């Protein structure tokens, strides 16, 4: 009887260890579907100009679609000057939950810049973090930036 209990406990322990090790090595897979939804976001950082860094902040709302497009709007302040901007672009997400957003930004219908962001999607796609990799003005001038964004899914 004692031998059967010991053997049963040994088998249960082995199965539990195997199951836990299988679960811990399985990684979540992401895709564009991970991000589909509406997010609220904040952006903070600086634009680097010859006279020194200029602070940038923004809050907004952005929608990610199943077709890999993004659109939304934000209110931003650059050095204390505010504007309401419209965003439109594309996004892609890799299986390791990193990705890219390329967004054109418009004020009163006029293109004011195109930004490329590197992203990471966390908490099963409920949150995202991003850093601006490149910002290009309509005349092809590259604007140096140190800007990050945090987004939370609204629905």
Enumerate the language-model features and the residues they cover:
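C-terminal segment of classical bacterial N-terminal signal peptides
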Residues: 15-25
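Mature soluble binding/inhibitory domains
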Residues: 25-155
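Bacterial N-terminal signal peptides that target proteins for export
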Residues: 1-12
């Amino acid at each position: 009887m004692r031998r059967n209990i010991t053997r049963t406990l040994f088998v249960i322990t082995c199965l539990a260890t195997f199951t836990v090790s299988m679960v811990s090595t399985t990684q979540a897979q992401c895709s564009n579907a991970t991000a589909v939804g509406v997010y609220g976001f904040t952006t903070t950082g600086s634009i680097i100009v010859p006279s020194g860094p200029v602070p940038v902040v923004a809050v907004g709302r952005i929608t990610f679609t199943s077709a890999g497009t993004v659109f939304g709007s934000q209110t931003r302040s650059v050095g204390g000057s505010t504007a309401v901007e419209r965003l439109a672009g594309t996004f892609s997400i890799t299986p390791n939950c990193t990705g890219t957003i390329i967004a054109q930004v418009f004020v009163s219908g006029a293109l004011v810049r195109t930004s490329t962001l590197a992203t990471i999607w966390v908490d099963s796609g409920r949150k995202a973090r991003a850093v601006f990799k490149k910002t290009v003005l309509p005349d092809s001038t590259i604007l140096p930036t140190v800007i990050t964004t945090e987004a939370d899914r609204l629905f």
